[in-house]
Regions:
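Conserved alpha-helical "signature site"
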Residues: 1-202, 207-216, 227-323
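Catalytic or ion-translocation cores adjacent to nucleophile or general acid/base/metal-coordination motifs
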Residues: 220-222
């Protein structure tokens, strides 16, 4: 059995009769992109800007190919990531040692304590919590996610009226959903759930980068509606993946993440074959379906095709996604 099929088999249960129709991937991607940048899908049906769009994509390709030009699209990966991840991947890590490292960052400390307080609130424990105990309460996976959220969130922040700024909130919202789903799917495939979480969170850095690249081409005067065209969106997605690979790969976040960045950057998310790549691709689909679900409708059984085939942890992850 091919590797991709084996991975899928680990995540899916026995097939059941379809009850929810699914848009073809190009249609879903188009609708999702319109949601991402705040353009009504029906408004994006106008003819594209022709030669200008071709020039825009060509100049984005020049940015992708230039290490110097790429460098300005995203902040550099903070040095704290490799050090903390190395500590957390060691099963012998001391909660006191980790707490000492975390205490040097006020924002990270607040995030860890907030997560631990949330966990304790579900039970009867009303004891006051300090940082060392918070580290013990949320465990390794909780720590990894808290660190990733705090350290990586600034990558997605943007202000102003640019294309990347108007999409920033949606990009982060989708990244958080995709990270949670990818963690669940990766765990079902026998992978470290955190590798899935990190993959889901960081893949959307490609969206931020490609939209910032487009923002830099102000002289072309091409607006969101022209870019959100059925013929153009697939080209933007391909460049999103290329930038993800080119920017995240050098951060050296671990062997699997390095290989994923190279794979996605080379062949695109739709064509990946590695187990982690397949987990990310499936999470990307589910997160997009969640974004496009009717307002107030969070039931996967009513909005996700082949819902009953998903493993229970994946269903639970989907059900726990925020609005």
């Amino acid at each position: 059995m091919p590797l991709a099929q084996a991975t899928a088999a680990a995540v899916l249960e026995a097939p059941v009769e379809e009850t929810v129709p699914e848009d073809p991937p190009p249609t879903r991607n188009y609708r999702f992109f319109c949601w991402l940048i705040g353009v009504p899908a029906n408004a994006a049906a106008r003819p594209p800007a022709g030669a200008l769009l071709g020039e825009l994509l060509g100049r984005v390709d020049e940015i992708i190919a230039s290490e110097t030009l790429r460098a300005g699209l995203l902040p550099r990966a903070p040095h704290v990531i490799p050090q903390l991840m190395k500590t957390l991947r060691d099963e012998r890590y001391s909660s006191t040692d980790v707490a000492d490292r975390i205490s040097r960052d006020v924002v990270l400390t607040a995030e860890v304590v907030r997560n631990a307080t949330s966990v304790l609130a579900r039970g009867d424990d009303d004891e006051e919590i300090d940082l060392a105990r918070a580290v013990q309460v949320i465990g390794t996976q909780g720590l990894r996610r808290a660190i990733a959220n705090v350290v990586l969130r600034p990558i997605f922040d943007a202000k102003g009226s640019s294309l990347s700024a108007r999409a920033a909130t949606q990009i982060w919202k989708d990244a958080d959903r995709k990270a949670r789903l990818a963690a669940a799917i990766a765990g079902e495939a026998g992978l470290d759930p955190f590798d899935g979480y990190l993959a889901g969170l960081l893949h959307n850095s490609g969206w931020t980068a490609v939209l910032r690249a487009i923002d830099n081409l102000e002289d072309l005067a091409i607006g969101p509606v022209e870019i959100a065209h059925r013929e153009v969106v697939p080209q933007v997605i391909r460049r999103r993946d290329a930038l993800f690979g080119a920017l995240v790969g050098p951060w050296k976040l671990g062997t699997l993440m390095d290989e994923l960045a190279a794979e996605v950057g080379s062949v695109g998310l739709d064509n990946v074959q590695s187990p982690l790549g397949c987990a990310l691709r499936d999470a990307d689909r589910l997160a997009a379906l969640r974004a496009l679900a009717p307002a107030g409708e969070r039931s996967g059984a009513k909005t996700v095709p082949r819902w009953s085939q998903l493993a229970r942890p994946v269903q639970n992850a989907y059900g726990g996604l925020g609005a």
